[in-house]
Amino acid sequence: MADTGDMEHIFKRFDTNGDGKISLAELTDALRTLGSTSADEVQRMMAEIDTDGDGFIDFDEFISFCNANPGLMKDVAKVF
């Protein structure tokens, strides 16, 4: 699993406008970089990660997702 520093680095790369949260557009751009462009897949991931339903992924939600998906995060860390 990526360590907290790696997760913070990845979060900041996804959060392109630096507002401390990842929007649907930012998630779409990040997943496109990883080779995923399906709008349905992006929507599904957003719904899964955005546990409070505010339309954004905050750092705590991102950490929870990373901890639940360590294999995926290793792959993401290699790209970012």
Curated annotation (Swiss-Prot):
PROSITE patterns noted in UniProt: EF_HAND_1, EF_HAND_2
Annotated residues for binding of Ca(2+) 1: 15, 17, 19, 21, 26
Record GO terms (molecular function): calcium ion binding
Coiled-coil intervals, chain numbering: none
Binding site for Ca(2+) 2: 50, 52, 54, 61
Entry annotated with the keyword Repressor: no
Record has Calcium as a keyword: yes
Protein name, per record: Polcalcin Cyn d 7
Source organism phylogeny: Eukaryota, Viridiplantae, Streptophyta, Embryophyta, Tracheophyta
